[in-house]
Structure formats: structure tokens, C-alpha cells
């Protein structure tokens, strides 16, 4: 975990609360806009989607790429971020 990005470290430092979706590591400004237009305005809403997919990273990555326009790198980073958050808080 020493190779954790500062953004991931910040996200994992506390409960999600009312954080905007842009707080999730791997979510660029452009992707955040796409997510907000699809109703995923808060990090907890995106986490809910991840949980609905039974924390299956590959399925979540396919979904965020196909439905929201994420790059493979964004998809990988965001799924890792949500998985790590679940490990810390659930």
C-alpha cells in the first residue's frame, strides 16, 4: 500500500459521507461530469453501483467504460479505490 496515490490515501482516510463523485481516485473532471449527468453525483452513489455488482471489479470496470465513457485507466483506478474503501470501512 506504500504506492498509494495521495488522492487514494485522502479518499481512504475517512468515511465517504457527502463527498462528490470527483473525490473517487481515478475519476477525471470529464468522467465526473458524465457520471453526474447519469445520476452518480456522490461517491456513495457510485459505491452503491459497485456494491450492486457484488464488488466485482471487472464488471464495474466494463460498466463504467461502456456506460460512462471512462478510460481503462480510470476504470481500473476507480474500482481499486472503491474496493479499498470497502476493505477499510465495511
Swiss-Prot record:
Query: Which SUPFAM superfamilies does the record associate with it?
Result: Barrier-to-autointegration factor, BAF (SSF47798)
List, alphabetically, the InterPro entries matched.
BAF, BAF_prot, BAF_sf
Any Gene Ontology CC annotation:
nucleus
Domain of life (superkingdom)? Eukaryota
Q: Kindly list the places in or outside the cell where this protein is found, as annotated in its UniProt entry.
A: Nucleus; Cytoplasm
Q: What is its main location?
A: nucleus
Q: Which UniProt keywords apply?
A: Cytoplasm, Nucleus
Task: Provide the GO MF annotations for this entry.
Answer: DNA binding
Mind telling me which SMART domains this protein's record contains?
Answer: BAF
- Function (record text): May play a role in BANF1 regulation and influence tissue-specific roles of BANF1.
- Kindly provide the name given to this protein in its UniProt entry: Barrier-to-autointegration factor-like protein
Question: Mind giving the lineage of the organism this protein is from?
Answer: Eukaryota, Metazoa, Chordata, Craniata, Vertebrata
Amino acid at each position: 500500500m506504500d504506492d498509494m496515490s495521495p488522492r487514494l490515501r485522502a479518499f481512504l482516510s475517512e468515511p465517504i459521507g457527502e463527498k462528490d463523485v470527483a473525490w473517487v481516485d481515478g475519476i477525471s473532471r470529464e468522467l465526473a461530469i458524465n457520471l453526474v449527468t447519469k445520476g452518480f453525483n456522490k461517491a456513495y452513489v457510485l459505491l452503491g453501483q459497485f456494491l450492486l455488482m457484488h464488488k466485482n471489479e471487472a464488471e464495474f470496470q466494463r460498466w463504467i467504460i461502456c456506460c460512462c465513457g471512462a478510460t481503462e485507466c480510470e476504470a481500473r483506478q476507480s474500482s481499486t479505490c472503491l474496493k479499498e474503501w470497502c476493505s477499510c470501512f465495511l
